[in-house]
Amino acid sequence: MTKLIVICGATATGKSGLALNLAMRLGSVILSADSRQVYREFDIGTAKPTLAEQKAVPHYLIDICTPRETMTVADYQEQAQALINSLPVSPLLLVGGTGLYIRSIVQGMKIPRVAPNYELRSQLESLGQTTLYGILQQVDPVAAQKIHPHDPVRTLRAVEVFYVTGIPISAQQGENPPDYPILQIGLDCEMERLSERIHKRTEQMIADGLVGEVEYLCQKYGADLPLLNTLGYQEIKQYLAGEISLEAAKELIVLHTRQFAKRQRTWFRAYPQIEWFNADDADLLDIVWQRIQQ
């Protein structure tokens, strides 16, 4: 019997809604695989499940960190795997769009437990991406072959791990896939439709109070909080600073979300184990339900 059902895909494809309905049918629970929903108080801009939704179906790995704490992929993997091993429910639903979180579970990634060194990161970032990638090619050519030259996040992390440990990150990584059955379900739709979904969701976030949420978080934690420089928050922060209009902020959120969604689609499409379903299918719930019953 399948122990874990993964529901993944780009942002705004309806993963959470599908998961909620499936969990209620299965009498199951949801494990979030979203790198921002782990943080408390970051609610509207992360499309975090509402309190009513969390009451209807138990959700885990949501609101487990303060905004000033750091949740690494290794931290997430450890906590998620502990829940998978201990929760007396089967199948569990692992739901989200953070590819590394999902990959850490379904492929059993071996991840170096190296805490972020922010002073070192600041020094490395000041070198610029081109120079930093050149350093990576020198100290860890194996990792450089797997990391795109224009991927600053993974480039920085790989160089950071080398400088902290003296060992290339590629030599510290590997995979130990779990021995339990996993069904991976991906949701996707035409890019034009996805753009419409993103626009609609952005408008809903504004209506739900995103501006007030960002204003509150800036006052409580300071506008330089790293999380406030992420998608949906950085644009509203610009609006609150008087740099752009609210309409311009919304347009930027839509643009940046579309760009993010394209990267997510590329990431997930690289994994042949994922079975894809049309997010716009009127009978999506029943179609996926039939697949689960097979």
From Swiss-Prot:
Pfam families: IPPT. Belongs to the IPP transferase family. Catalyzes the transfer of a dimethylallyl group onto the adenine at position 37 in tRNAs that read codons beginning with uridine, leading to the formation of N6-(dimethylallyl)adenosine (i(6)A). ATP binds at G9, A10, T11, A12, T13, G14, K15, S16. Its EC number is 2.5.1.75. It comes from the Bacteria. The gene is miaA. It catalyses: adenosine(37) in tRNA + dimethylallyl diphosphate = N(6)-dimethylallyladenosine(37) in tRNA + diphosphate. This is tRNA dimethylallyltransferase. It is an enzyme of class 2 (transferase). One of its GO terms (biological process) is tRNA modification. The record marks T98 as: Interaction with substrate tRNA. Its cofactor is Mg(2+). Keywords: ATP-binding, Magnesium, Nucleotide-binding, Transferase, tRNA processing. Monomer. It comes from Trichormus variabilis (strain ATCC 29413 / PCC 7937) (Anabaena variabilis). GO terms for molecular function: ATP binding; tRNA dimethylallyltransferase activity. The keyword ATP-binding applies. Residues 34-37 are annotated as: Interaction with substrate tRNA. Substrate binds at T11, A12, T13, G14, K15, S16.
